[in-house]
């Protein structure tokens, strides 16, 4: 497929081979005509970039404000995440990458009192304990939340309450919605689907959720009830 435009973070200090591979692949397609902008350029509408991209007559993609497009002092790379919001008619769908509490706090200060409720919130940082904080969730008031994670994976911690999606995320999101879905389930043999691929669709009035494995809400899943509680 042909890539028309790439939008990525405005700053990074990453030296990993994965990041270097991304830069190589990005620069190769840019050399063939793909447009490349940073989130900072988009938000400031510089160098040909736009803050809002109209994908169809009814669908737009907006690059939202993030303090760390401009302030490179955070010691957590996750806060450099590109924050995007899709709009379909009068409905909103929010993606915040791996944004952490520090970035969320700045976001709330910037948009406080002027942010519409969202139909979908793709949980930041895989449903970590350091994202999806109370003030942030109160601002966006999500109807549905989807977690892209390997539920119960102990790669980063052996304490089950801190594996993704974490107990802190679950407790906080539960104040706003029980429509929470997670993609995968950790297994020592191989990854297994929890909900599987999660597709959120809208006709402009109603929003529906379809999954390749099942549409069981996280709170009703066997994993949640046998492992978390």
Predicted regions: what is each one?
Residues 15, 19, 77, 93-97, ...:
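Solvent-exposed, acidic/flexible segments
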Residues 1-41, 142:
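Active-site HxH/HxHxD metal-binding segment of metal-dependent hydrolases
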Residues 5-8, 13-14, 104-195:
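Cap/insert and terminal regions of metallo-dependent hydrolase folds
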Residues 25-31, 52-55, 111-114, 171-174:
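Short, conserved catalytic or adaptor-binding loops enriched in Gly and charged residues
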Residues 38-116, 120, 191-229:
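Core dinuclear metal-dependent hydrolase active-site scaffold
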Residues 25-28, 43, 132, 175, ...:
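A generic structural signal for solvent-exposed, polar alpha-helical segments
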Residues 1-5, 30-35, 59, 88-92, ...:
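Loop/turn elements at helix/coil->beta-strand transitions in domains of secreted/extracellular proteins
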